[in-house]
Amino acid sequence: MSEYNMEEIFMEKKLLKRSLTFAMMIAVVFSTIIASSFIKANAAETEKAVTLIQGEKTSQYDTVQEAVAAVSADKTQAVITLNKDFEGAGAVVKKDQNIVFNLNGFTWTINSLVGSSGTETNGVQLLQGSTVTIENGTLTSKTASKLIQNYCDLTIRNATLSGQDNLTEIIVSNNNGSTVITGNSTVQAAAGGIAFDSDKWGGYQGGNVTLEDGQVIGNVNATNGGKISLNGGTVTGDVIASNYTYQGNEKTPANIVIDGATINGNVTAQNVGNISISSGTVTGLVSSESASPVAVTGGVFHTALGENVDISAAEYVASIESNGQAKTVVGKTDFDAAVQSLKSGETINIQVVPENSILTIPEGVTVTNKTNNSIVVNGNALNAGENIIIQPEQPEPTPTPEPEPTPDPEPTPNPEDNNNMTESNNNEQSGSLTSPQTGNDSYSILYISLAFASAALLTMVSFTIRKMSKSK
């Protein structure tokens, strides 16, 4: 066998060995992936729905209800975490239990209800004296009349709560303790239902509810001594403070404070309800059917203020007309913001400002003084009842330059002086003929030097090319 054939056989064996090694590596990788997937799938099948962490102890349960029952009633915080979507019974949190329901991005769907004996209509019941947080996921039910019946201190953070149309009356009903809704949460009522309420019922003190952030879709009601603060977020629905009668009911006013929220709906005080608005935005009608007017000291209102609304405590009030739409701004903060955003063609009707106020209004805006005082607008006095259209500022006139003084005529030269001057000039000109032109000569020398350098460089390049050609 020739040396060439031996080398060829050796290379083939080497290639075959490498191929087998590569195939074994691929097999190991795929086996590892398959085994890992099997282990994960098996773990997912065996993993229980809920994990409870209480102190240093971690336990798993099949249902949320079992995990809640295992939490100690000693005010020590426990965390119940969903490991997957869970559908099952609701839960009752008892006095002195402190539980964080971490929904962990999953959904807890309640299909079996809890509550007082004979009235099991709640998805979750939070008893007086407990502390509860619901966060990071979705809580819903298609069977609950009240998704959450709350008598405790409750925090809803970054959670979505919803019910069933034509069945769920209230998503979060608050009769005691305090409730805070924050962290981009969503509370969505069933169609025509109540998103949350606050009501002093029976022997309870009334749940104090605060909306800090998030979306509320549905009505918001405070009744019979309930207290609600809408400090942020958006409510798409009506806001109502009222009372209803039942045996032994005290005529205690309900109270709602709007301080920063946006209300896409009507705001109404009824019976002996109290409502105050210090900032925020309302797109619907603000009115009072109560003995007490709605007190407004700030805010932006896209519908004309209705009956029994008191703005007497506000230092700044104006209405703004734009493209057939009108809004009312109340309070210095909202007044200043509205003035700064005025555009040409709009009208501002100033209703209340301090006397002799000095205002700066953009050009093209019509200003009407509907106060009883004089004001100053862009430096012009505007008396009560007057109006003005702000004109563009006129540029300052260009000052006329002063004429330059005429120089005195030069004296007539003496002929003898001219002769002497001519001789002097001739002598200077004859002398200048022998003066060297240093500037021009310098440039000439530079050009000649560059030419010689270029020629030398071309010669060297040509010589090098010829030498390389000969060497080949």
Q: What are these language model-derived features?
A:
Residues R18-T21, S442-A453:
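Short, hydrophobic alpha-helical membrane anchors of single-pass surface/secreted proteins
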Residues T32-K48, L433-I445, T464-S469:
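Sec-dependent signal peptide cleavage junction
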Residues A49-T81, A318-N349:
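Acidic Gly/Asp/Thr-rich repetitive segments characteristic of extracellular carbohydrate-active
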Residues A73-A78, V92-N102, E120-K142, Q149-Q164, ...:
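Surface-exposed loop/turn motifs in large extracellular/passenger domains
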Residues Q77-I99, L103-S112, I348-I375:
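N-terminal extracellular ligand-recognition/capping segment immediately after the signal peptide
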Residues N271-G324, I361-P392:
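Leucine-rich solenoid repeat scaffolds
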Residues G385-D441:
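C-terminal low-complexity, Ser/Thr- and acidic/Pro-rich disordered "stalk" regions positioned immediately N-terminal
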Residues S454-K472:
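C-terminal membrane-anchoring or membrane-association module
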